[in-house]
Amino acid sequence: MQHPPLDSIRNIGIISHIDAGKTTVSERILFYTGETHKIGEVHDGEAVMDWMPQEQERGITITSTATVCRWGAWWINLIDTPGHIDFTIEVERSLRALDGAVAIFSAVEGVQPQSESVWRQADRYQVPRICFINKMDRVGADYRETLRQMEEKLGARPVLLQLPVGVEASFAGVVDLIAGEFLTFSEADQGSTVERHPIPAEIAGEAMAVREELIEAAADFDDAILADFLEGTAIAAERIRAAIRKGTIACRIVPVFLGTALRNRGIQPLLDAVAAYLPSPRDIPPVTGQRPDGEAVDSLPCDPAGPLCALAFKVQADEGRKLTYLRIYSGTVKAGGALWNSNRGCFEKAARLFRMHAHKREPIDEALAGDIVAAIGLKEVLTGDTLCDPAHKVLLSGLTVPEPVVALAVEPRGVDDRDKLLPALEKLQWEDPTFRVHEDEETGQTILTGMGELHLEVVTDRLGREFGVQVKTGRPQVVYRETITRPAERQEVFRTEFEGKVQGGEVHLRLAPLHRGEGVRIVVPPAEVLGITRELHTALTESLTRGASTGCVTGYPLTDLEVRVITVPVEQGVTTEGGVRAAAGRGLMRAARDGAPTLLEPLMDLEIITPTEYAGKVLGSVQQKRGRVEGIITQGNTEAIRALVPLAEMFGYMTELRSATKGRGGFTMEFSRFDQAPASVLQQFGLA
């Protein structure tokens, strides 16, 4: 493929709640752009974008998948992301690298919990979005209710650019409100032919009224449109589109489109909208970062001739090597070229470059600013690392990585498995920053931690399939957090004798509790203020950071406390880096013990969908689980129950809910926050 002009590139992601139809939409995009010659269906396990065996068997997306397709003059780098909360890091890192997104909502279920979560992630990275309300052919489809929920739950300003013709089973197509046409999609060729007709008389009045609302929204971004609208002057379609594009890129409005991907209706207008309203790499603000000395650098515009700056937003294990996905923000990467890894402080070599088509690869010689590509040969790289020109070193901000909340003990089944287990787990950790591994000091067991039961279930399944490692697993356990309840202070002195010479370190620490959700704040004054060398300063900071990952009583990570370094007395000929590390680590643990430690447990935002006849039984179950009901919404013959529930009470809940609702209920949940654990839990750890 010849490299396209920057203005014609669209780097986009598909985001939504699980089962809203992301992958079904992605498969139609590939088909209508000519990248595939057959539509792969998720329910048949044939989706091109869901290529992992676990995805095909479960009918869900587990890992974000990248591909490239052409739509007219436009070049679309497309990433399909998971909708299940356990794989939220896949959404996080994709949004970090993308310029725009298509948010998919079900016209039946509306804005669901994980939809809210991914929307907040997109807000955090200021990613412009358009919206596709899917499943318009389903019984109970109500796009107006979905629009209302977008406003209420997401704080979005949706702008309707289409109207449906027909509802539920009679859904026939959409009215393009800007062009003033009724669009249908031929069933004879799986929707490939888009036919244009006059707007049906029965909805012409509604179409005119909604078009006026659309023009009013466009007028917020073009004063001339407002003047012409008030004077009754005709406004050209291209002027309206330009104004809508301006508002979309500014993240002030969200254009909304309608359709049913499974029935092959509405995808081509969505592709037109990707080209018309979502930004090119040139439209997004220039990337900024820091120099190695901490000073801010000038912004780096998206220019292939500029200094190289790229983000490694995903690392995947590939036959023992690392396959690294790169977003090129500035400059050019050549196959075989040397790069500087700002996070690891070392040179790397991109031996080979590829354009990815799901799990298939197209070798390329170079990648330019605006590209999303993959590289083999980067040995030290991890997710979130910055790769740049050695002559223009820069460090970009990394990713927001959520902390794991579920733990699982594993042990190898046989001797051969024991030798292969840790190397396999290391490779899986390359891929997933939310997956952690450690050894229980008391039992010697290998402990896996992750975002949920499904997350760890997929990990153990991959151990067997991809690495040939068979393991026995324990029951999932909650990952608690330790914190302190009162201030504490410690002057820690460490001394040891090595080859007849006394060595050591001394650190004065002050700890204070923080509000819930503030995490760990480590305050270390600059080296010159403390009167220590840069090497001692680094040793001190690293020791405190490492120490905070292990609590003083239970071994669970510390959270919601401030660790402040007051002084670091230096004794000439005695103070060493190792001594300072030991004093800092031991001082932190002892100070935390003096701070009246306690445990925090993870609380989950839970949404249960149940037939009304079983709602009473379900509510009783939630209350028995120490849950706090926060809202109940009636939707026809079903109830949507929202509650805050401790994760410890939720293991195996799907089986319980199915039994209570005769298989008709379902639920979703996502992490909310850590809060005080009850006395029964504290007693287990000797803290009550």
Curated annotation (Swiss-Prot):
It is found in: Cytoplasm. Pfam families: EFG_C, EFG_III, EFG_IV, GTP_EFTU, GTP_EFTU_D2. Keywords: Cytoplasm, Elongation factor, GTP-binding, Nucleotide-binding, Protein biosynthesis. GO terms for cellular component: cytoplasm. InterPro entries: EFG_II, EFG_III, EFG_III/V, EFG_V, EFG_V-like, EFTu-like_2, G_TR_CS, P-loop_NTPase. One of its GO terms (molecular function) is GTPase activity. GTP binds at residues 16-23, 80-84, 134-137. One of its GO terms (biological process) is ribosome disassembly. Residues 7-282 form the tr-type G domain. It comes from the Bacteria. PANTHER family: RIBOSOME-RELEASING FACTOR 2, MITOCHONDRIAL, TRANSLATION ELONGATION FACTOR G-RELATED. Belongs to the TRAFAC class translation factor GTPase superfamily. Classic translation factor GTPase family. EF-G/EF-2 subfamily. Catalyzes the GTP-dependent ribosomal translocation step during translation elongation. During this step, the ribosome changes from the pre-translocational (PRE) to the post-translocational (POST) state as the newly formed A-site-bound peptidyl-tRNA and P-site-bound deacylated tRNA move to the P and E sites, respectively. Catalyzes the coordinated movement of the two tRNA molecules, the mRNA and conformational changes in the ribosome. This is Elongation factor G 2.
